[in-house]
């Protein structure tokens, strides 16, 4: 039996689709607050006046929790200290506002009760530790949630072994987004943002300063958000452009202390993990709100990188790590499409020994804490090492874990993306907890995805797959632009192996690299072909009912199949292959998809109960889509 038929829907996901509305008595006129289903509601409570630097510390010694209760579901949502409640605009570091962000998954009436308590290190203590109650004005109330609007997608939830799905629309999510710059949040207009060191290690991407995104300022349009007199237009314009070009996700670090960029952290300073910067985090939220509400983008939140995975509590999920994760969940976990990534290049590899690394026990503890504390059950993944051995050492002990839901695969060479995806889709399903697998960093590390007009010089004798087959590649010389190869071997390779898409990494030494990227138009062509590929799958391929298989075609072709119903055969080099339909009854309509030029043509019909030869209609890579015709 195929793995998707064995997959059990989560209780939470079923609740979102199947529950009845709440109390009929409560209406928009009688409730304390109103919001549409899946809309964001900020509830501000007037509590004790304090500051980011106060004693008792509002981030360690207070805990705000709000319980939201619907007839069919109860959510316990962590809150946070919000200074004056308008810190993004005022820059305030003091005030008496305590806030919770709530995004209701069910229409009808909700009741809420907020509890603020005080005690030494109470913020990270077990929930059973009560602390001393602190009065809150407006601690109880009601929320009336109207039905979702006609264009509402809802939250991304796990309702399939290999794919996420929008809870309201039911559409499956395939990812095509930006994996660079990883230090997106090192932006000049965010308060308290700077580099804490000007040292660069050999082989790192280098940046001359913070991001400005001046090339995207013109992409900001009237009505878009900004803060403090018009700040933020560069980064808001940047994500506007990216979404308009077809990208639907962005990968970014929220803490790179001691890492490559050394310019992103949520704290007041880079060396005190007990106090957060309220105005900076409120400004991050302006960006995230725009990406979510206005652009429909996934937030791929990478919580640490390899150089700092033991910075907090030596890698354990101790007080510092719990405090950090709780603040991220409280402020940002409500968004519709959040992926929590426990760390970039997480775990042991040959270079992480010098920094310290998390072992599998620590990794699983971190994932478990995220799963336990996040009321919205957001997607949890780990970013891997690039080569087979270290990746296998990292992932094997994590197989079968219930909290970890997916992989952000790093793959050393483009031609290995299919095999890497296929291996871990299969292994995870065999261990009872299938992973959603995307390729989120493609190697080699120095190159990634070339700019549209760019070529680079090979650093390690890397051979472009297409160039090798054409005559040997160009090691240690200028290489041909690799976008076409990455489209075929990485994006198509991942999708045909049962993966869920890709985010594009820009390498250490290419123009607009992984740290220094200032203009996403440098890869404009890549965003367009990524969108076209995913649009083809979304519009024409019933991929959620299909499984990757190596049994029906010889090497050189990749196949997704729902045997007896539908088949997709991809030929990365074009040419001819055979498709074994000996066990498939009926007649099949054949359509050819020209993957490079985004064109579909009719290929006639193909009979079942035989091995059939299929030949691409022209040079280049093609996909054959076969669907059984009605008798």
Positions of the model-derived regions?
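C-terminal motif of bacterial Sec signal peptides marking the signal peptidase cleavage site
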Residues: 17-18
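Aromatic- and carboxylate-lined catalytic core of secreted/periplasmic carbohydrate-active enzymes
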Residues: 50-52, 436-437, 444-451, 458-604, ...
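Active-site mouth of glycoside hydrolases
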Residues: 63, 119-121, 150-418
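Ligand-binding face of N-terminal immunoglobulin V-set domains in extracellular IgSF glycoproteins
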Residues: 55-60, 64, 77-143
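Extracellular glycoside hydrolase catalytic/binding regions
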Residues: 323, 344-516, 521
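Solvent-exposed beta-strand/loop surfaces of large extracellular or lumenal domains
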Residues: 72-91, 594-611
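Non-catalytic, glycine-rich low-complexity segments
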Residues: 22-71, 77-78, 83, 142-147, ...
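Bacterial N-terminal signal peptides that target proteins for export
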Residues: 1-8
């Amino acid at each position: 039996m195929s793995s998707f038929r064995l997959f059990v829907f989560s209780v939470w996901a079923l609740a979102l689709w199947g529950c009845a509305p709440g109390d009929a008595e409560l209406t928009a006129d009688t409730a304390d607050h109103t919001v549409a289903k899946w809309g964001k509601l900020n509830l501000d409570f007037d509590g004790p006046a304090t500051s980011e630097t106060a004693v008792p510390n509002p981030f360690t010694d207070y805990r705000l929790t709000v319980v939201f209760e619907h007839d069919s579901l109860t959510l316990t949502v962590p809150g946070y200290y919000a200074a004056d409640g308008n810190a993004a605009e005022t820059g305030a570091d003091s005030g008496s506002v305590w806030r919770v962000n709530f995004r209701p998954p069910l229409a009808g009436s909700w009741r809420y009760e907020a509890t603020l308590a005080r005690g030494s290190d109470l913020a990270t203590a077990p929930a059973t530790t009560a602390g001393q109650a602190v009065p809150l004005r407006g601690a109880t109330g009601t929320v009336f949630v109207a039905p979702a609007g006609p264009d509402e997608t809802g939250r991304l939830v796990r309702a399939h072994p290999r794919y996420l799905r929008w809870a309201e629309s039911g559409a499956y999510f395939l990812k095509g987004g930006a994996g660079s710059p990883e230090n997106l949040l090192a932006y000049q207009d965010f308060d308290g943002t700077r580099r804490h060191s000007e040292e660069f290690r050999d082989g790192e991407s280098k940046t001359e300063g913070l991001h400005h995104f001046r090339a995207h300022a013109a992409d900001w349009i009237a009505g878009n958000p900004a803060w403090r007199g018009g700040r933020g237009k560069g980064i808001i314009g940047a994500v506007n452009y990216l979404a308009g070009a077809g990208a639907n996700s962005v990968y970014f670090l929220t803490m790179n202390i001691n890492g490559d960029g050394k310019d992103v952290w949520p704290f007041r300073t880079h060396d005190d993990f007990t106090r957060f910067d309220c105005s900076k985090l409120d400004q991050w939220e302006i960006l995230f709100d725009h990406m979510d509400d206005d652009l429909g983008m996934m937030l791929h939140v990478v919580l640490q990188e390899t150089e700092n995975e033991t910075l907090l509590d030596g890698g354990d999920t101790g007080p510092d790590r719990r405090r950090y994760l709780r603040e991220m969940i409280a402020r940002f976990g409500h968004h519709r499409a959040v992926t929590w990534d426990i760390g970039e290049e997480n775990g042991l590899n040959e270079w992480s020994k010098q920094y310290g690394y998390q072992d599998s026990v620590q990794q699983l503890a971190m994932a478990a804490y995220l799963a336990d504390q996040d009321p919205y059950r957001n997607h949890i993944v780990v970013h891997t090492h690039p080569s087979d051995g270290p990746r296998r050492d990292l992932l094997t002990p994590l197989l079968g874990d219930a909290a970890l839901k997916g992989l952000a695969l790093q793959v050393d060479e483009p031609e290995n993306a299919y095999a890497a995806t296929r291996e871990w889709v299969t292994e995870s399903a065999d261990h009872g907890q299938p992973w959603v697998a995307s390729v989120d960093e493609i190697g080699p590390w120095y190159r990634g995805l070339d700019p549209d007009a760019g070529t680079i010089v090979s650093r390690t004798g890397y051979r472009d797959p297409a160039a090798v087959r054409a005559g040997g590649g160009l090691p240690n010389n200028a290489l041909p632009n690799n976008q076409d190869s990455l489209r075929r071997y990485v994006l198509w390779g991942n999708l045909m192996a049962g993966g869920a898409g890709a985010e594009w990494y820009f390498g250490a030494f290419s123009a607009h690299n992984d740290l220094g990227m200032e203009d996403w138009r440098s890869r404009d062509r890549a965003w367009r072909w990524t969108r076209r590929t995913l649009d083809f799958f979304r519009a024409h391929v019933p991929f959620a009912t299909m499984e990757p298989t190596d049994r029906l075609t010889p090497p050189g072709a990749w196949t997704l199949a729902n045997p007896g119903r539908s088949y997709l055969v991809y030929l990365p080099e074009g040419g001819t292959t055979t498709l074994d339909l000996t066990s498939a009854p009926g007649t099949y309509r054949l359509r050819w998809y020209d993957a490079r030029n985004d064109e579909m043509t009719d290929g006639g019909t193909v009979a079942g109960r035989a091995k059939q030869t299929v030949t691409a209609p022209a040079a280049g890579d093609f996909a054959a889509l076969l669907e059984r015709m009605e008798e």
